[in-house]
Swiss-Prot record:
It comes from the Bacteria. Pfam families: SfsA, SfsA_N. Gene3D superfamilies: 2.40.50.580, 3.40.1350.60. HAMAP family: SfsA. InterPro entries: SfsA, SfsA_C, SfsA_N. It comes from Clostridium tetani (strain Massachusetts / E88). Belongs to the SfsA family. GO terms for molecular function: DNA binding. This is Sugar fermentation stimulation protein homolog.
Length: 230
């Protein structure tokens, strides 16, 4: 997908809370919105080059969203709103091999008491629930999720197990918001419960996908599947 709004580089200064950061742009220090509640501390380092997307909503307090940054010369998109859009585009194009048979794609659908990112279906009546997680944490080519403890994420995985146990298709897709990575693995050091839930999901037959992206400052698209090590 193409990011059609204006893009601008800036120098990262500090992040006083999850939602706000200060950057230097055109020799002026300004406050920007951070559309990611994760830590991103390996990317948002003082002095680092970051990328801003200009927003036009007149009711906003900030003019820009901070959508990514450079780490060792590699651009990483950190916008938490992007993964679902990228995956929806890939589903419609048939670029996720195992899910190509589903031609009905619905966003934000519930099953029981659970709400999942996608409900997929086809003309044969088959159903499949898919949850998407954006991945921004990378170390030496190894990508991990989560970068902060996530009770909500663990709940999603356990709910997918319940769906699968009822005979319905279920999967989680980790969208790695960068390119040229080695593999994906759960971040057990950060969140043991999530990591154990993911292993349990795999054993229960829930599909565990990881895809890296082709990404630059003004575009991002699902590229190729990446090995998952549990």
């Amino acid at each position: 997908m193409i990011i059609k709004k204006n893009i601008k580089r800036a120098e990262f200064i500090k992040r006083p809370n999850r939602f706000q950061a200060y950057v230097k742009v055109d020799n002026e220090e300004i406050m920007v919105h951070v559309p990611n509640t994760g830590r991103c501390k390996e990317i948002l380092i003082p002095g680092t080059t970051v990328v801003l997307r200009e927003e036009s909503n007149p009711t906003r307090k900030t003019k820009y969203d901070l959508i990514g940054g450079y780490k060792n010369g590699k651009f990483i998109n950190i916008d938490s709103q992007i993964p679902n859009k990228v995956v929806e585009e890939a589903l419609k194009l048939g670029n996720i091999k195992k899910l190509k048979k589903y031609n009905i794609i619905k966003r934000e659908k519930t099953y029981g008491n659970s709400r999942f990112d996608f409900k997929l279906g086809n003309d044969s009546g088959e159903e499949y629930y898919l949850e998407v997680k954006g991945v921004t944490l990378e170390d030496g080519g190894v990508t991990k999720f989560p970068d902060a403890p996530t009770e909500r994420g663990t709940k999603h995985i356990l709910e997918l197990i319940d769906v699968k146990n009822k005979g319905i298709g279920a999967g989680v897709l980790f969208l790695i918001q960068m390119k040229d990575v080695k593999y994906f693995t759960p971040n057990i050091e950060m969140d043991k419960n999530f990591s154990e839930a993911l292993v349990s999901a795999h054993k229960a037959g829930v599909d565990i996908f990881a895809y890296e992206c082709d990404v630059d400052e003004d575009f991002i698209t699902l590229k190729k599947e990446v090995k998952v090590i549990l």
